[in-house]
Swiss-Prot record:
This is Exosome complex component Rrp4. GO terms for molecular function: poly(A) binding. Component of the archaeal exosome complex. Forms a trimer of Rrp4 and/or Csl4 subunits. The trimer associates with a hexameric ring-like arrangement composed of 3 Rrp41-Rrp42 heterodimers. Keywords: Cytoplasm, Exosome, RNA-binding.
């Protein structure tokens, strides 16, 4: 919903519950998941508030289906902008993450957008770790640790973050089974993003379909056996 100008009664990055008071008609324009009663606006959803002081816009973004950052989590991110000393990274969250140059390379780098774009460009996918986050500042990422870094190729699949544990399986059993049966690699982010890497397009497609099946049936029992049967049937057909 897009409303008229409001006087806001919430802070930037504040988490709001359904029915929580956001603001009333005044200086700011209200957008997103809100409803109006008289002159007052309330949140429709469990969401996070963003306040754009420059453009005088307050917005409620739903948290459902989005990833809430946690320090130590491994995430699949997409570079969306390049600054002078860092990259902005979409991590499937209401909060845009920051990847500083110091968390990418230890070698001296000429600080310029052109130089940074040679390391990571807009649209590149990365596997990164969240090293810090609180509600007062954006998540900070690193890719300096082993197995982290740019993901050069693969097919991106997005699922609700809460269903990622079912894709991984107990002690990684589900991921290992899919990889072994299909000869592919699954790069799994705790933010609901999975990259399927493989040389055979048909097997990559089967892996994607298997992930979608896990997503749809995550609440059921006996899922590992059904996924194995599903893959074996697809390979025979």
């Amino acid at each position: 919903m897009r409303g008229g100008a409001v006087t806001i009664h919430v802070k930037d990055r504040q988490i709001v519950a359904p029915g929580e008071f956001v603001g009333e008609q005044g200086r700011f324009r209200v957008e997103g998941q809100v409803f109006r009663v008289g002159r007052k606006y309330y949140s429709k959803v469990l969401g996070v508030v963003t306040v754009d002081e420059e453009n005088r816009v307050v917005k409620v973004i739903p948290l459902k289906g989005k990833y809430f950052p946690v320090e130590g989590h491994i995430v699949v991110g997409k570079v969306v902008d390049i600054g002078f000393t860092s990259w902005e990274v979409d991590i499937n969250s209401p909060y845009v993450a920051v990847l500083p140059v110091s968390e990418v390379t230890s070698r001296p780098v000429t600080i310029s957008r052109n130089e940074l774009s040679r390391i990571l460009d807009v649209g590149d996918l990365i596997l990164a770790k969240i090293v810090s986050f609180d509600l007062s500042k954006d998540p900070v990422l690193t890719i300096k640790e082993s197995r982290l870094g740019k993901i050069p190729r693969g097919t991106l699949v997005e699922i609700p973050p809460q269903k990622v544990p079912r894709v991984i399986g107990r002690r990684g059993s589900m991921v290992s089974m899919i990889e072994d049966l299909l000869g592919v690699k699954l790069i799994v982010g705790q933010n609901g993003r999975i990259v399927v890497v493989g040389d055979d397009p048909q097997r990559v497609e089967i892996a994607v379909l298997a992930v979608r099946k896990i997503e749809a049936e995550a609440h059921t029992t006996g899922l590992t056996d059904r996924i194995k049967q599903f893959i074996e049937e697809r390979l025979r057909s």
